Amino acid sequence: MMIERHLRSQFGGGQHAGTGAYMKYVRIPGTAQPRNGRQDSVQKGEKMIKLGIVMDPITSINIKKDSSFAMLLEAQRRGYEIHYMEMNDLYLRKGEGRARTRLLSVEQNYDKWFEFGSEQDIALADLNVVLMRKDPPFDTEFIYATYILERAEEKGTLIVNKPQSLRDCNEKLFTAWFAELTPDTLVTRNAQQIREFWQEHGDIILKPLDGMGGASIFRVKHEDPNLSVIIETLTEHGNFYCMAQNYLPAIKDGDKRVLVVDGEPVPYCLARIPKSGETRGNLAAGGRGEARPLSESDWEIARRVGPALKAKGLIFVGLDIIGDKLTEINVTSPTCIREIEAAFPISITGMLMDAIEKRLA
């Protein structure tokens, strides 16, 4: 009851009236199960959901932090038939998207967290849903995989996230469609334009459009003698675009990852706080994670972006927010489920699987 009172006081009314719907995703203490959520989707008279997942090798994941693993646990709890795939399992034959799959079972066991069952060669359209959870880089191989998945989508398989939207929505450039929510942003490969932007703001962030985990992100302060070489490095002497944004001092309080499930924000986020002397909050760059309830500005940003994400078939998305500014929209393989669920009594994977089942209905 204490947990329920906490969520009601946090989300049950006020400016977020209607968010009492999150109550069904309260987890029973000491378990992974939602208190009021569905216990098993395979009930009498129901057809088993066949779920495929395309991911990096399950042999090398850290199950304590891996969001894909959390999704698999919830899918298994609901009685789904899970088909495991890696990128090299996908192929096209006579215009049909196909794959070599292995049936998969998982458990919360740090010594043995998965077991493969039978192997089969199937049409991807035989699956009800496929989770595309391959981590970046978003390169030509990733793009080719989306075309293969799209062939199954055309025959009725739900792909999470939608293949066309994975191609269309670059995680950094997509913020331009919500410019009123972002820092001042410049995307260019022109060195002079970058210098003028730097002179205007005096303290800027420069980053590539295809990076992840904080790689190749530079802070350039006033009179920094390294500006020219940084521009040359990121643009490869004017041949590639990069992004410039004014520096946000609020980064000291964390780069917040706000998860959005089929247009609806998860009521908690993970703030990635930079280590001393660092600009980047990314956990991969040494940042420290701290789970928090959403702030009013977090809610506002997520509510304004959510409908566009849902319309594009972007069912599971991670917004990056610094202070009250949107900096990135992560669509390829968003993370932080495990960290948030470890800190607060909510089943994010329950929200996701319910959204998937609603779309399949």
Language model features with spans:
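Methionine residue identity
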Residues: 1-2, 23
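Short hydrophobic alpha-helical segments enriched in small aliphatic residues
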Residues: 7, 17, 23-26, 37
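Short, Lys/Arg-enriched N-terminal segments with co-localized hydrophobic residues
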Residues: 38-47
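Redox-cofactor binding/interface segments in oxidoreductases and associated redox assembly factors
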Residues: 53, 131-132, 245
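Conserved N-proximal alpha/beta basic substrate-recognition cap immediately N-terminal to
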Residues: 59-187
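Phosphate-binding site of ATP-dependent enzymes
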Residues: 68, 191-192, 199-203, 210-301, ...
